[in-house]
């Protein structure tokens, strides 16, 4: 599997349940997300624009993905908003197409255009490593089956890990899509 095949397999609507461990506080927080993924071809205007934004030759891109999400976390305050969109563009290394440059118009940890690295590991998981000005994020996505995707991520700030997250993402049919709602703290023990 290559990264574009991973994005094509990820296309559609997903419902995510996650637990984020705030390591410095020794506390865990649960949350839910509604996620939409659309694989984009190399000639898609969004891919061309992201490449140009990062001063990269669009002809080197193999495609990418558009992602939209709406999320809620158990500790959210009333005015907190966890929703947005981003576009990923993939530019594989010339000597190894299983890894390369990942361009984003918007990062997750910091809302700025960002370039990171991606690779497909030996278990066909997509691994994204993004270095921000004040932190590093490492995300790993893999499929348990075609309708169940798993994700882990860590955020390291100033030399120490401060969050670790585990997500279970289930594919949903269009008619079953609902908005994310705050997850009670006990939900992690209740299943779906």
Swiss-Prot record:
Keywords: Lyase. Pfam families: CpeS. It comes from the Bacteria. InterPro entries: Calycin, CpcS/CpeS. The keyword Lyase applies. Its EC number is 4.-.-.-. CDD domains: lipocalin_CpcS-CpeS. GO terms for molecular function: lyase activity. It is an enzyme of class 4 (lyase). Belongs to the CpcS/CpeS biliprotein lyase family. Covalently attaches a chromophore to Cys residue(s) of phycobiliproteins. This is Chromophore lyase CpcS/CpeS 2. It comes from Synechocystis sp. (strain ATCC 27184 / PCC 6803 / Kazusa). The lineage of its organism: Bacteria, Bacillati, Cyanobacteriota, Cyanophyceae, Synechococcales. The gene is cpcS2.
């Amino acid at each position: 599997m290559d990264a574009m095949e991973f994005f094509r397999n990820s296309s559609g609507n997903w419902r995510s349940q996650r637990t984020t461990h705030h390591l410095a506080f020794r506390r865990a927080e649960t949350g839910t997300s509604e996620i939409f993924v659309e694989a984009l071809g190399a000639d898609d205007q969004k891919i061309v624009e992201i490449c140009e934004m990062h001063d990269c030759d669009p002809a080197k891109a193999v495609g990418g993905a558009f992602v939209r999400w709406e999320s809620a976390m158990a500790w959210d305050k009333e005015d907190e908003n966890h929703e947005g969109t981003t576009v990923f563009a993939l530019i594989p290394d010339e000597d190894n197409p299983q890894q390369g440059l990942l361009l984003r118009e918007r990062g997750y940890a910091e809302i700025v255009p960002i370039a990171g690295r991606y690779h497909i590991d030996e278990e066909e998981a997509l691994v994204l490593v993004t270095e921000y000005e004040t932190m590093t994020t490492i995300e790993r996505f893999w499929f348990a089956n075609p309708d169940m995707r798993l994700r882990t991520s860590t955020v390291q700030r100033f030399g120490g890990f401060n969050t670790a997250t585990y997500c279970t993402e289930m594919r949903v049919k269009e008619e079953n899509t609902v908005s994310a709602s705050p997850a009670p703290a006990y939900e992690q023990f209740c299943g779906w």
